[in-house]
From Swiss-Prot:
Residues 2-193 form the Glutamine amidotransferase type-1 domain. PROSITE patterns: GATASE_TYPE_1. Tetramer of two components I and two components II. The keyword Amino-acid biosynthesis applies. GO terms for molecular function: 4-amino-4-deoxychorismate synthase activity; anthranilate synthase activity. Pathway: Amino-acid biosynthesis; L-tryptophan biosynthesis; L-tryptophan from chorismate: step 1/5. Its EC number is 4.1.3.27. It holds the Pfam family GATase. This is Putative anthranilate synthase component II. It catalyses: chorismate + L-glutamine = anthranilate + pyruvate + L-glutamate + H(+). It comes from the Bacteria.
């Protein structure tokens, strides 16, 4: 197992890195602007970090996903969540109220391996101004959790090891962040480089 963390220049990225360090998993951090066509080749897992702006501001993420989405285990966080949802055909919308530094309640609604051995409700930290529309959610994806305001908070692909969370598991406001990352890394990737 080897993990590539794509740094989209969010202040939370290195909080995620600190959580990964605790898991004793070999990893590399790569700035998004340095992402090249074959960069992810020798990694089994890819973590797409939070970041500013919207997914389309990062075309290199879409190029990387086009090449590797069927070959790697992928987790998106915040911007990474939005990127994965949009890649598979989801639609973003601008939230009426920006959620920066808000604690909400996550409501798990599936047996997603990401939430294995966790309660069906727990606290999460939100830092976002965009959401993914539930109404026209891509058929190949399953919504696995909402917040207490019914905003999509987590999803998984129906047949590939691809997962994402809108909330920040690395935030001090989020319960079980380390466990969520541990659960993701325990899910077998489709290939083992």
């Amino acid at each position: 197992m080897k993990l590539l963390i794509i740094n989209n220049h969010d202040s939370f990225t290195f909080n995620l890195v600190d959580l990964i360090r605790k898991l004793n998993v070999p990893y590399d951090v790569l700035n998004v602007e340095d992402l090249k066509e074959n960069t992810a080749e020798n990694y089994s897992h890819i973590l797409i970090s939070p970041g500013p702006d919207i997914p389309r501001a990062y075309p290199q993420l879409f190029s990387m996903l086009e090449k590797y989405y069927q070959q790697k285990s992928i987790l998106g966080v915040c911007l990474g969540h939005q990127t994965l949802c949009e890649f598979f055909g989801g639609t973003l919308y601008n939230l009426e109220n920006v959620r920066h530094g808000q604690k909400r309640t996550l409501k798990v609604r599936s047996n997603s391996p990401l939430f294995f051995d966790l309660p069906t409700e727990f606290n999460i930290g939100l830092y976002h101004s965009w959401g993914v529309q539930e109404e026209d959610f891509p058929d190949c994806l399953e919504i696995t959790a909402l917040c207490d305001e019914d905003v999509v908070m987590a999803m998984q692909h129906k047949s590939l090891p691809i997962y994402s969370v809108q909330f920040h598991p690395e935030s001090y406001m989020s319960d079980f962040g380390e466990k969520i990352l541990r659960n993701w890394l325990a899910i077998p990737p489709t290939t083992n480089p």
